[in-house]
A protein has these predicted regions:
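Active-site-surrounding "flap" and adjacent substrate/cofactor-binding loops of secreted or lumenal enzymes
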Residues: 52, 59-84
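Conserved beta-structured recognition patch
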Residues: 53-55, 112-176
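A structural motif detector for short, solvent-exposed N-terminal "entry" segments of globular domains
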Residues: 19-60, 112-119
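Intrinsically disordered, low-complexity Pro/Gly/Ser/Thr-rich segments with frequent PxxP/GP/PP motifs
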Residues: 74-101
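Bacterial Sec-dependent N-terminal signal peptides
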Residues: 1-21
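Short, Lys/Arg- and Gly-enriched loop/turn segments at beta-strand edges
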Residues: 99-112
Length: 176
């Protein structure tokens, strides 16, 4: 019985530690392209171990409502580090998206963001699930920067938790 409990604890601890713990600023966006094919790239500033997961969405942030992603009708893409060696700070990762599917320069992806709008949109990186997340970074490319609240799929408030790691650009289709 003791051996079973020890093994269970050992395996559980190893599984839990496989996921790197990330916080605001541990990732920054380097580029985005809303013209087909949609793509974006980012740099990581923390070590990512095998199994680490990052998620991305073009949902807008609602400051007035609930300080969360409301109307979660837009897409979510999940990237997983599948390599056996850790990714080190300074590593750049690219994601490409089309109606046929999404791919990454390293790791694997599920979901797709091929509808990233050239009429203005936003892109957020987060750790966790949409209903329980840690925001890492954001970029907004609509109008004259961030709005005070989300009013449609092309608008977004700037989340306070990543204010130092959220870039607001004027209406732009592609930025490198």
């Amino acid at each position: 019985m003791r051996i079973t409990l020890f093994l269970f604890g050992f395996v559980t601890t190893n599984l839990l530690s496989a996921q790197s713990q990330l916080g605001p600023g541990d990732l920054h966006f380097l580029s985005f392209r809303t013209d087909a094919p949609v793509s974006f790239s980012f740099v990581i500033w923390s070590r990512l171990d095998h199994g680490s997961t990052l998620s991305f969405t073009d949902n807008g942030w609602a400051a007035q409502d609930s300080n969360s992603f409301t109307h979660q009708s837009e897409d979510v893409l999940e990237w997983v580090h599948t390599g056996s060696t850790p990714l080190l700070p300074g590593t750049v990762i690219g994601i490409g998206c089309s109606p046929a599917g999404a791919f990454a320069t390293t790791g694997s992806v599920t979901g797709n963001l091929y509808d990233l709008s050239d009429q203005g949109d936003q892109l957020f990186a987060f750790h966790g699930r949409l209903d329980s997340l840690v925001l890492l970074a954001g970029i907004h490319f609509n109008g004259n920067g961030w709005e005070s609240d989300r009013t449609d799929p092309h608008t977004s408030a700037r989340p306070a938790s990543i204010a130092m790691h959220a870039i607001g650009l004027t209406e732009t289709d592609n930025a490198f």
